[in-house]
Amino acid sequence: MIICISGMPCSGKDEFSKVLAAKGFKVLRMRDIIKEMMDDAGVSIDRESMRTFSTSLRKKYGDDIVARLMAKRIKAARMSKGIAICGIRGEPEVLALKKLLDDSFLSVWMETRADIRFKRMMKRKRKDDPMDLKGFRKRESIEKGWGTESVRKHADVIISNEGSLADLRKSALLLISRLNTNA
């Protein structure tokens, strides 16, 4: 089983992935591919340099390049109980993964209102997160420009994540339970 987790920043993708990891899934993150390529190229890694690097990578090799590279990793990691892919950033990526990994592929969209995501971002205080509403809106604009929201229409499951962390964990466990029942 391969579960692709998508959503806007602070929608709960990483927390959802943690639940899957606790249930034996191997979690792979799209951003890790970009970070490794940047490291190999000797490029310093921060949010802005990652955006610039990934944008130039997509222009040079196609919008689905990160997905194609991820597909190779997934094929190498097939021994796991399941695989969770976190952080799809556009329609070409989800379509490429569906095509390349046709068996047992499930796309999950984390649905969370912008005001809730902004509050979460302020609370988590990651080094590369914007620290004000203006910065948050700029980041939203960049994500939308990449087509992150377009991934939603390809979701097999939409999980509303506007409650507590415990609520999200319950939703994740319920989904895993349903998948195990249908397997």
PLM segments and residue spans:
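Walker A/P-loop
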Residues: 14
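ATP-dependent small-molecule kinase phosphotransfer cores
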Residues: 26-99, 134-138
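ATP-binding Walker
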Residues: 11
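Conserved phosphate-donor/acceptor-positioning beta-strand/loop module used by diverse small-molecule
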Residues: 86-87, 100-125
